[in-house]
Regions:
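Extracellular polysaccharide-recognition and catalytic grooves
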Residues: 1-213, 217-219, 224, 361-417, ...
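Short amphipathic beta-strand/extended segments with alternating polar/hydrophobic composition
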Residues: 92-96, 102-105, 196-202, 225-230, ...
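Catalytic and substrate-binding regions of extracellular carbohydrate-active enzymes
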Residues: 126-129, 136-371, 459-461, 467, ...
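Short glycine/proline-enriched turns and hinge-like loops at secondary-structure junctions
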Residues: 209-212, 322-323, 337, 392, ...
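Solvent-exposed beta-strand/loop surfaces of large extracellular or lumenal domains
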Residues: 240, 353-369, 431-445, 599-606
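Short, hydrophobic/proline-enriched secondary-structure or compact coil segments at domain edges
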Residues: 295-299, 397-399, 494-503
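Short, hydrophobic/aromatic-enriched beta-strand segments in well-ordered soluble domains
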Residues: 343-345, 411-418, 422-440, 463-474
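Non-catalytic terminal regions with compositionally biased, polar/charged low complexity
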Residues: 452-463, 470-607
C-alpha cells in the first residue's frame, strides 16, 4: 500500500475533473467571510452534515484535525443559526423544506474540540447545542452504549461538560445578515417565537435556486406567514415544479410583463445590496443588539424583460411585542414600453378579505385576466378562483389562519393605490415547502395558498408598490389603526413615497422614501428628508424615534439630523434621554440643543 499519508492527501488536496478534493469543494462552496454554503438552506444543511462527519472520521481514525486544513468549517457550523426564523425553523428559499436545524454538525464540532483540546471551541458549541437541544447529552449518558472497536463509523457517546450553560439563541443570530454567495439577506428584531418579526430576502445565486427576482418571506406569530412555495408534489421531474413552483408567480415578488424568468437550479442572478442598517455582521453576544428600526435596499436586474427593480424593506419595532413591516418595490423596464408589473404576495391561512383601506367594498368580480394567454408564463394559469377590481384606492387585505384554539392569526396588509392599478384575490397551489413541516395549524397539502396580486399597468417605478404588513391574532389585536399615503413634494423628478402609520397607543410614524438619496422630499406635516428611507416616530406629540437611512437630511418641526455624505442614524428616546447609533459623522438638533457626532458608533450610546 501507499500508506495513510497518501490517501489523506488524496482526499484532502488532489482533484480530478469530476472528483474534487475536500479542500477544493470547500473553497468553491463556502464563503470564508460568512460561512454560508452556496446552495439553498435545505441542501446547505446536507453538505454541512457531511463535512462535519468527515471531521469526526479524520479525528477518530486518522488522528488528523480537519478543521486546521479547512478553517471555514467551525465558522460554517456557527453560522447555521442565521437561517432560523424565530420559531427555530430554517428559511424556505430555493428547493428547501423548512424544518428545525440539524444539530449533528454542532455535536461534531464539540467532539473535534474535545479530541484536540480546544477549550474555547468546546465552550462555544456546547452552549449552542444546549440552546438548540435542551436534552442534548442527557440521553447518551443514560444508555449503556457498547462501542465496537472494529467499526470505522461508530460514535462514542457524547459527554457534555455540565458546567457549560446553554447559550441564548439571540447570541447566535444577527439583526441583519447578508450572504452574497446565495444572494440572501435577513432582518430580524429578536428571536421570540410569538412576538419577533423577521424578513428573509433572496434572489437566485448558487445551486437549487428558483427564478424569483427579489423574493421575500415574512414571519409573524409563530409562523412564516408569507412563505416561499416550495418544490412541488413531483419534485424536479414534475410539471408543477417547472411551470409554477420554480417560477416568479409562486414567490412574493414582482413579475414584469408576465414574462420574468431565467434558469433555475444553478442560477447566477443575484441582487446588489445598495444600503442597509445595521451593517451585516456575524452573530455576537451584545446588549441592545436589535435596533428598533432595520432596513435594506437591494437592486436586481430582471434579465428576461430587461427591467430594473429595487426593494426597500424595513422592520419597525413599536414595543416589546409589537411592530410592522414596510415594503417599497420599484420596477421598470430599462427601455420603457412597460406593459405591466405584477406584485405577488402569498400568505398562509384559509380565509382572505380584500377591501378598500377605508373599509368600503371594492366589488371584486370573477376574472380570467391572470393567465398565460398573451404569451405569459404558464405559472399564471395555476392561479384560480380569481376576482379583481380596477381601482386607484388604497386597499387592505387580511389573511386569516383559523387556529384550533380559536386565537386566529391574521396578516394585515395595507397597500397604496395608484392610477391604472388592478387588485386581485386568488388561490394558488398549496404551499408545498411547508407540507412536511411539523406542528402546522391545518393540513397544508389540502389548502390552496391565499394570494394577493396588484397589477400596475405601465411602469411601477414612479408608481411603486408600497405596502405595510402587521401580524396580529384575536387576542393580540392589530396595533395599527390606519395607514395612509400622504402626497410628497420634490423639485426633483423621481419615485418619492410618503407613508403615515397611526397606532392605537397614540404613536404615529411618518415615513419618506426616495429613489434618489440626495433628493429633498417634503411631506405636508413639516417632515423633510433626503434619504433612501427616513422615519419620524411621534407619540402623543413627543418625538420617540428618528431614523435616517442612507441620507443626508431628516428634518421635523422640532428635530433634525444632517450629514455631508449619506449616513445611517438611529435616535431613540428612552426614560433617561436620547440614545443614538450612527454610521458616520453628522449633526443632530433636538430640544433646542445641537450635538455634533464626530465618528461612527455601532453600539447604542447616550446623546
Amino acid at each position: 500500500g501507499k500508506g495513510r499519508g497518501y490517501y489523506i492527501d488524496y482526499v484532502l488536496n488532489q482533484s480530478g475533473i469530476r472528483q474534487w478534493s475536500l479542500k477544493k469543494l470547500a473553497d468553491y462552496g463556502y464563503d470564508p467571510h460568512t460561512g454560508i454554503w452556496a446552495e439553498c438552506p435545505g441542501y446547505s444543511g446536507v453538505v454541512m452534515n457531511d463535512y462535519a462527519n468527515f471531521t469526526s472520521l479524520f479525528d477518530r481514525n486518522l488522528h488528523c484535525d480537519l478543521t486546521k486544513e479547512l478553517p471555514v468549517l467551525p465558522k460554517a457550523v456557527a453560522a447555521t443559526p442565521q437561517y432560523l426564523f424565530p420559531n427555530r425553523m430554517i428559511c424556505g428559499f430555493g428547493d428547501t423544506h423548512p424544518n428545525y436545524l440539524n444539530t449533528t454538525p454542532v455535536v461534531r464540532m464539540i467532539e473535534n474540540a474535545q479530541v484536540n483540546g480546544k477549550e474555547e471551541q468546546e465552550k462555544y458549541f456546547t452552549a449552542l447545542l444546549k440552546c438548540l437541544d435542551p436534552d442534548a447529552g442527557k440521553a447518551a449518558a443514560k444508555k449503556n452504549v457498547r462501542v465496537s472497536i472494529n467499526s470505522f463509523f461508530d460514535d462514542k457517546p457524547l459527554t457534555l461538560k455540565p458546567d457549560i450553560r446553554a447559550g441564548k439563541i439571540e447570541d447566535y443570530v444577527s439583526p441583519l445578515f447578508y450572504a452574497p454567495n446565495v444572494s440572501w439577506l435577513v432582518q430580524r428584531n429578536g428571536m421570540h417565537p410569538r412576538h419577533s418579526l423577521m424578513i428573509s430576502l433572496n434572489a437566485s445565486e448558487g445551486n437549487h435556486m428558483h427564478a424569483n427576482g427579489i423574493s421575500m418571506e415574512l414571519y409573524g406569530k409563530g409562523y412564516v406567514l408569507g412563505p416561499d412555495a416550495g418544490i412541488g408534489l413531483y419534485l424536479y421531474s414534475g410539471l408543477d415544479y417547472a411551470e409554477y413552483y420554480s417560477q416568479f408567480p409562486s414567490h412574493n415578488t414582482v413579475c414584469v410583463d408576465g414574462i420574468s424568468s431565467y434558469p433555475v437550479m444553478q442560477s447566477n442572478h443575484s441582487f446588489d445590496l445598495l444600503s442597509c442598517f445595521p451593517a451585516s455582521s456575524a452573530a455576537a453576544a451584545a446588549k441592545d443588539k436589535f435596533p428598533s428600526v432595520t432596513y435594506s435596499d437591494v437592486y436586481f436586474r430582471e434579465p428576461e424583460s430587461r427591467a430594473d427593480q429595487t426593494r426597500m424593506m424595513s422592520i419597525v419595532t413599536t414595543g416589546p411585542e409589537t411592530g410592522y413591516y414596510v415594503d417599497i418595490f420599484r420596477s421598470r423596464k430599462e427601455r420603457g414600453g412597460d406593459k405591466m408589473h405584477d406584485y405577488f404576495y402569498h400568505n398562509l391561512g384559509q380565509e382572505m378579505t380584500l377591501a378598500a383601506a377605508d373599509g368600503t367594498d371594492l366589488h371584486l368580480q370573477p376574472t380570467e385576466e391572470l393567465a398565460f394567454a398573451g404569451a405569459h408564463l404558464g405559472a399564471y394559469s395555476y392561479l384560480f378562483d380569481k376576482k379583481c377590481a380596477r381601482t386607484g384606492k388604497d386597499v387592505k387585505a387580511v389573511f386569516t389562519i383559523r387556529m384550533p384554539d380559536k386565537d386566529d392569526i391574521r396578516m394585515n396588509m395595507w397597500m397604496k393605490g395608484e392610477k391604472d392599478r388592478t387588485v386581485f384575490s386568488a388561490l394558488s397551489p398549496m404551499t408545498e415547502g411547508l407540507s412536511r413541516t411539523p406542528g402546522m395549524p391545518y393540513n397544508i397539502k389540502e389548502q390552496p395558498t391565499l394570494t394577493f396580486v396588484a397589477r400596475q399597468k405601465g411602469e411601477a417605478w414612479n408608481r411603486p408598490f408600497v405596502a405595510v404588513y402587521e401580524p396580529s391574532t384575536v387576542k393580540e389585536t392589530e396595533q395599527i389603526s390606519s395607514v395612509t399615503f400622504p402626497e410628497v413634494e420634490s423639485k426633483q423628478p423621481g419615485s418619492h413615497v410618503g407613508i403615515c402609520v397611526k397606532q392605537k397607543n397614540g404613536r404615529t410614524d411618518y415615513i419618506l422614501s426616495s429613489d434618489g438619496a440626495t433628493h429633498p422630499c417634503l411631506m405636508g406635516n413639516g417632515m423633510k428628508a433626503s434619504a433612501t428611507y427616513a422615519l419620524w416616530g411621534n407619540r402623543q406629540g413627543e418625538n420617540c424615534t428618528l431614523f435616517l437611512g442612507n441620507g443626508t437630511l431628516l428634518q421635523t418641526p422640532s428635530a433634525s439630523v444632517k450629514a455631508d455624505v449619506p449616513v445611517n442614524v438611529l435616535l431613540e428616546k428612552e426614560a433617561d434621554g436620547w440614545y443614538y447609533t450612527a454610521s458616520g459623522t453628522c449633526t443632530v438638533t433636538l430640544g433646542g440643543k445641537t450635538y455634533k457626532i464626530k465618528k461612527g458608533v455601532t453600539k447604542k450610546t447616550k446623546l
